[in-house]
Regions:
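Helical cap/lid subdomain of alpha/beta-hydrolase-fold lipid enzymes
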Residues: 1-187
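Extracellular glycoprotein-like low-complexity segments
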Residues: 183-412
Length: 412
C-alpha cells in the first residue's frame, strides 16, 4: 500500500499477537499494530527492528524488501496520486467489489512456531481492496458487484480477468463510442454495503494438507484432489456458486454461502499437525464457530467431514491417519480423540523415516520400533485368549441361569 492508502484506510495492515513471544521486539518498537506508511515501510524493509532475510522456503517469515525500491515506489505515488488529466480526456475508474480479499496480516504462533494469519474483507476483488482501486482522480467511478456477478454469471471472475467480464466490456464500449455508462445489476455508481450481504462460512486449514468441498449438487471448490499432488503447480477450482478459495503458505480458506450442507475432504501432503477452523463471516466480521487443533497428519492421511450451515458447530471429522481404513472421530472440543497405539507407532515410524540422520542410526531406530510392534502383537493375542475364556465363563453362567440372557448380551 502507498502513503495515500493509509490516509484513506484507518484499519491496520499488520497486527502482532500479544501472546507470541517472537513479536515482542516488534511490539516494543511499533506498538500492537501498523497503520501508518512510515511504520509499514520500516517493518517491510527490516530497518526498524533488524531481522535477517528469510530463506526462499520460509514463507511464514516476513520478507525483507530493498529500501531504495520502497522509496522509489513512494515517490512514484506522491507524483501521480494527485495527477489530473487534461479536461478533454475522459477518465473512468472501476473497482471490483464483493469477493473476499486479504486486508491485513496477523503475526502469531502456529503449532508452536512463528507464523501468521490473514484478515479478510469483502470489499475487494480477491486481490485489490477497493480503496486502492479507486485511488486516482477520475471523472467517473463505478463499482463492479462481483459478489452478485460470480453467484449468477461466472463464479471464477476476479481481479486477474476483470477486463474479460461482460459488464466491463460494456463500459469499455461505452467509453470508446463516447456514450454514457449505464448502471445495471452489476455496475453501480454507489458502493454496495457489506451489511447487505448474506453471511458466509469460512472453513480453513493450517497444515500440510490440501482442502476441498462439494456442495449438494456435486460442485467442487478447493484444490482438485484428482491430480499429482506433488507437482509444483496445483489446479484450483471454484465451481460452487458464490464460493471463494484462498491460500497463503500452508493455510487454505474456503468461503461458502451459508446455506445447505457441504462435504469436505482433505488429504495429507506431509508430516505435522493440522488445525481445522470453522468461522462465520458476516458484514466483514469473522466469528469463530468451531476449532479442531493439532490433528496428526502424514502423507497418507485423509479426512472427511460435513458442515451443515444451520449447525456448523456440530461438525465432526472422520480421520484415516495412515490410509489403512482405520478411522477415528474428531469433535470440536479443542482436539482429537486419543490415538490408538497402532496409529501412534505408525506416526513415529513415518517421522523417523523423514529424519536427516545417518542411515545406520535410522535403521536401528526402525528395528527397535519393529521389535516393539511384535511384542504388542504377542500381548494382543494373549489378551484375545483371555477375553475368549472370559466369554465362555459368562456363557456358562447364563446356561446355569445365574446371569440373564439380556445381561449376557450387554456384556458381550
Amino acid at each position: 500500500p502507498s502513503p495515500r492508502y493509509f490516509d484513506k484506510v484507518s484499519d491496520p495492515v499488520i497486527t502482532f499477537d500479544l501472546d507470541a513471544s517472537f513479536t515482542e521486539a516488534w511490539r516494543n518498537f511499533w506498538g500492537p499494530s501498523i497503520n501508518t506508511y512510515a511504520k509499514f515501510s520500516s517493518f517491510v524493509t527490516g530497518t526498524g527492528v533488524v531481522r535477517p532475510k528469510p530463506g526462499e522456503m520460509f514463507l511464514q517469515d516476513p520478507e525483507v524488501l530493498r529500501t531504495e525500491l520502497m522509496d522509489d515506489a513512494a515517490n512514484l505515488h506522491n507524483t501521480y496520486d494527485d495527477y489530473q488529466f487534461p479536461a478533454h480526456i475522459r477518465t473512468v475508474q472501476v473497482a471490483g467489489w464483493g469477493v473476499p480479499t486479504v486486508k491485513a496480516i496477523k503475526y502469531k504462533k502456529s503449532h508452536g512456531f512463528p507464523g501468521y494469519d490473514t484478515n479478510f474483507t469483502i470489499e475487494g476483488d480477491k486481490t485489490v481492496v477497493y480503496p486502492s482501486a479507486i485511488s486516482s482522480v477520475a471523472d467517473e467511478t463505478y463499482f463492479f458487484d462481483l459478489e452478485k456477478y460470480r453467484k449468477n454469471e461466472d463464479n471464477n471472475t476476479q481481479h486477474r480477468d476483470l477486463l474479460n467480464a461482460g459488464p466491463i466490456q460494456n463500459i469499455l464500449t461505452s467509453i470508446i463510442e463516447k456514450e454514457n455508462v449505464v448502471e445495471n445489476n452489476f455496475i453501480l455508481t454507489t458502493k454496495p454495503q457489506a451489511t447487505n450481504l448474506n453471511d458466509q462460512l469460512i472453513v480453513s486449514t493450517n497444515s500440510p494438507v490440501i482442502l476441498g468441498a462439494y456442495d449438494q449438487l456435486g460442485n467442487f471448490t478447493g484444490i482438485d484432489p484428482n491430480q499429482n499432488l506433488s507437482a509444483d503447480i496445483l489446479n484450483i477450482k471454484e465451481d460452487i456458486p458464490g464460493s471463494t478459495f484462498m491460500y497463503t503458505n500452508e493455510s487454505q480458506y474456503i468461503f461458502l454461502p451459508k446455506e445447505g450442507s457441504y462435504n469436505f475432504i482433505y488429504k495429507g501432503t506431509g508430516n505435522g499437525p493440522t488445525t481445522v477452523e470453522i468461522e462465520n463471516f458476516s458484514a466483514d466480521v469473522t466469528t469463530p464457530v468451531a476449532s479442531y487443533t493439532d490433528i496428526p497428519t502424514t502423507p497418507n492421511t485423509s479426512a472427511t467431514f460435513t458442515v451443515e450451515s444451520t449447525t456448523p458447530e456440530d461438525t465432526v471429522i472422520t480421520l484415516d491417519l495412515n490410509g489403512n481404513g482405520e478411522e477415528e472421530i474428531i469433535s470440536a472440543d479443542g482436539g482429537s480423540t486419543e490415538l490408538s497405539l497402532n496409529q501412534l507407532i505408525t506416526l513415529i515410524k513415518e517421522k523417523i523415516s523423514t529424519l536427516v540422520i545417518k542411515d545406520k542410526l535410522k535403521q536401528n531406530l526402525l528395528k527397535q520400533i519393529s521389535s516393539l510392534e511384535k511384542k504388542i502383537e504377542n500381548k494382543k493375542q494373549k489378551n484375545i485368549k483371555i477375553l475368549a475364556n472370559l466369554g465362555k465363563k459368562i456363557s456358562n453362567q447364563e446356561i446355569k441361569g445365574k446371569i440373564s440372557t439380556a445381561d449376557t448380551v450387554e456384556i458381550a
